[in-house]
Amino acid sequence: MTVAALALALAALGWLGAGRGASQGEPIGLFTTLPILWADSPELGSELRPDATPHWALKVFADRGTIEPLDVLTPSHLAGLRRLVIAQPRALGPAENVALDDWVRGGGHLLLLADPALTLDSEFSIGDPRRPQAVALLSPILGRWELDLLFDDRQVMGETSREVLGLETPVNLPGRFAARGQANCRLWADGLAVTCAIGKGRVVALADAAVLERGDPSGTRPRAFAGLLDAAFAAR
């Protein structure tokens, strides 16, 4: 789905611009393969049905600013943003890695969700470009920040709750970050999360994306995601 189509869908749902209680704060860039802005369904226009339920994360975003969907990461796309969420993205191209690194070092605040073994179910078949990215492939940009994303394949699948930055956060087959001894990064929950001061900017990264799944009978996900956003976007 293109950015134009996403913007149309968001406007129809009332989540773009000043709709449905959105604050007048700064825009928040969103770069993701997860079905947050659209329905995980091959049916055309399914997210615009009157009975369609918007993803709960849209309200969390709207409480903090307006969503700016991104298809690519370039200097021109990032220039008007100070806040960015990258959630289980596709692999970045070389120029995108440079643009993102420059943006963070110039003062950008990034929340990154990088899942090495995504457990989210999808109606799209394996190989369909609309299917969420199964494995985070972010070694080049993480390497620029002297981080490694690791995965223990001996884990048993199943959702659990872990405390991250003081937040009870649902995870499922999470990875962990390893730092290379740099003083500007701090690991949390045995590496499940990491916070880094990079240049004038900040990165808060979580090695799992289960927090953004739609199902949430306990209300844990919105609280955890809101806390992660606030940690990433707080002034330095």
Give the positions of each predicted feature.
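Short, surface-exposed patches at the edges or C-terminal ends of soluble domains, predominantly
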Residues: M1-R236
